[in-house]
Amino acid sequence: MLNLLYLILGIICGTITGLFPGIHPNNIVALSFLILPYFGLDNYIPFLIGLVITHYFINFIPSAFLGVPDDETAVSALPMHKLTLNGNGYEAIVLAGFGSYLGVVFSILISLFLMSILHFDVRAFYCSIKIFIPFILIAFILYQIFTAKSVWEVLVIFLSGIFGIAVLYCSEAFNITLTAIFTGMFGIPLLINNLKTYKIKSQMMAFPDFELKFLKSSFFASVAGFFRIFLPGISGAQLNYILSKILNERDLKNFIVSQGSIILSNEVFSLLAVIFIGVGRSGVARAIQLLNANININTAIFSILISSTIAIIILLNLSKYILLFIRKVNFKFLSLFFIIFCSLVVIIGSYNTYLIYHIIVYLTAIYIGLLAVKSNTNLSNMMNVLIFPTILYFLRG
């Protein structure tokens, strides 16, 4: 019963972090040395699970309504924001939330099937495919280049990749570094673009029709999320990007469902990987790994399911009130507020970790993002900021 109270506390904290762009569960994890003595190990883990699961559900709100993503929602933010500008913001939230919940369920079923029934050897499989990963990514970059529709698109691909190598491979990266990169590339340029908008359209508060193809997309997205266990250095947003290119999904609703699934499946698999192979692939999962706690699989799954159920209820209700609020305020001033807020997050977050360096990174990311927006380039091409350094990481061995 006590664990459930701490799980709910984590859900409350995840709701808060999810609402504000630039605030990440890793910021809470960084305070572990302060929180852990008061919570105790057995209570702290449910708190972290509730925090991270809820965060990614609620984070669809700033992604959809403002177009401001984090490192996981970078690919899905733009199509969701487009629906908001067209008066269908709530529909975007419902689709993403529904896909996320399906992703959680499918991830748990896939994990139990592979690990408990088939006794799948994850470590052996990873060792067998590791050597091929950089070549798969190189082929993927070549595919992007040859299918590019303009010189600007190719330029964005290479600028993003070179920028990623300089910042993430050749230099030391911190938690705030990714925040500066993704907020600068994907968030601020869209917020600057939003400065032209004074009011958003009246929003339809209706649930979209359920389609069976949502289940198929969600399942394949969850399977793709499973591969994150084998790909250190590759984020959920990269997998989102690669999956979107492979599936060539043209149905916007189906695309948002699949993106919701892969975002949550990434995190669920990251958490369960700590139990199955002793390795965490996300900031929160690594924090749990470092605690060296003996985690019961049933407790973990129960915590994940409870968190997801409560989180989607919060998401569907809270988003209605926020949409009504946004309709009443000047959208230009709201966008300006979040430009200032996101910039302050980067400045404060990097105050003790090379402030000037991170400001330069942030401004460079904004420049590349503005170039992509103004040239009407597919913003997902900027995900090469992670793919280029990941290739070098694997080639280095």
Swiss-Prot record:
<feature type="transmembrane region" description="Helical">
    <location>
        <begin position="331"/>
        <end position="350"/>
    </location>
</feature>
<keyword id="KW-0472">Membrane</keyword>
<feature type="transmembrane region" description="Helical">
    <location>
        <begin position="354"/>
        <end position="373"/>
    </location>
</feature>
<feature type="transmembrane region" description="Helical">
    <location>
        <begin position="44"/>
        <end position="66"/>
    </location>
</feature>
<keyword id="KW-1003">Cell membrane</keyword>
<feature type="transmembrane region" description="Helical">
    <location>
        <begin position="297"/>
        <end position="319"/>
    </location>
</feature>
<dbReference type="GO" id="GO:0005886">
    <property type="term" value="C:plasma membrane"/>
</dbReference>
<dbReference type="InterPro" id="IPR002823">
    <property type="entry name" value="DUF112_TM"/>
</dbReference>
<dbReference type="Pfam" id="PF01970">
    <property type="entry name" value="TctA"/>
</dbReference>
<feature type="transmembrane region" description="Helical">
    <location>
        <begin position="255"/>
        <end position="277"/>
    </location>
</feature>
<feature type="transmembrane region" description="Helical">
    <location>
        <begin position="150"/>
        <end position="169"/>
    </location>
</feature>
<keyword id="KW-1133">Transmembrane helix</keyword>
<protein>
    <recommendedName>
        <fullName>Uncharacterized protein MJ1079</fullName>
    </recommendedName>
</protein>
<keyword id="KW-0812">Transmembrane</keyword>
<feature type="transmembrane region" description="Helical">
    <location>
        <begin position="92"/>
        <end position="114"/>
    </location>
</feature>
<feature type="transmembrane region" description="Helical">
    <location>
        <begin position="173"/>
        <end position="195"/>
    </location>
</feature>
<feature type="transmembrane region" description="Helical">
    <location>
        <begin position="2"/>
        <end position="24"/>
    </location>
</feature>
<feature type="transmembrane region" description="Helical">
    <location>
        <begin position="124"/>
        <end position="143"/>
    </location>
</feature>
